[in-house]
Amino acid sequence: HALERPTAPLLDPTAFKQAMRNTAASVNVITCAADDGDYGMTATAFTSITADPPTVLIAINQSASLHAHLLAQRRFCVNVLRADAQELASDFAGRLPPEQRFGEHAWHRLPSGNPALEASSAGFDCEVRELSQVGSHLVIIAEVQHCWHSAHAPLLYSNGRYGQFA
């Protein structure tokens, strides 16, 4: 299929969203420990920036319940979900209310205080270094303080569906 080229001077956000649906991304649960409890949300906007120092980028909608806690705590954990964790992804994407999300799954506490998912494909415990507001989202650049990985394949999201490498 040929690529559709925009004809208007400004790209329509709907066209952009439709094109982005054709990309694939790992499915992650971003967690943060706050004074009044643990908070978390499902996110696909996560990528590495550099290995020296180990640095990652996440982007979250400013309307997300996690937003204020990330700003206050300035640390978070990226839990890369395993390929068999579709239900967990849905729990943290809003199927369960925030106060019920952590009770359904096994977690351990990192030295930073952040909750880490026992059954993750990989994890990154991070400290915020830079913040930038871009449209509706907060872009966070963070240095990785601790990371781990398992032999389990990650859960992927593309074109509105969960999947994994064949």
Residue ranges and their predicted role:
Residues H1-A166:
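Basic, polyanion-binding surface patches
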